[in-house]
């Protein structure tokens, strides 16, 4: 369980409370962003809201498997953000992301080393560890985008 605790800690670092790798995390970057900025488009870049949705989409999809459901996520739907038209819409998206992230980390913490090495749904997807670490790496990739887009939005105002 030491491995799962370390992996869960890395996951929480990027999403909820860490500063070790990037000196920031999603919660720090997005919590104080008004919905108007979250939906502000800079050229062809994704919006902050779209990136938050995208990361949450994958977390929720893998979380569904952790909780006994099927793997239903598809890349083509991962940016299918419903319209954000109010503070309430934006807050709901963020609250869903934070809640899913904490549930995800909790499931990871409870995984045995043996479970981490089991095939994830199908052998073609690798094992649980690979998929969890993939979510962490994917999250850091987009965290860099979030940070840069946020700076661009602030500079454009």
Explain the meaning of each model-derived region.
Residues 2-5, 11-23, 27, 35-80, ...:
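Short, contiguous alpha-helical
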Residues 33-36, 111:
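Structured helix-beta-strand junction loops
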Residues 8-16, 87-94:
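Active-site rim elements
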Residues 84-118, 130-135:
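Acidic/histidine-rich alpha-helical segments that form the ligand environment
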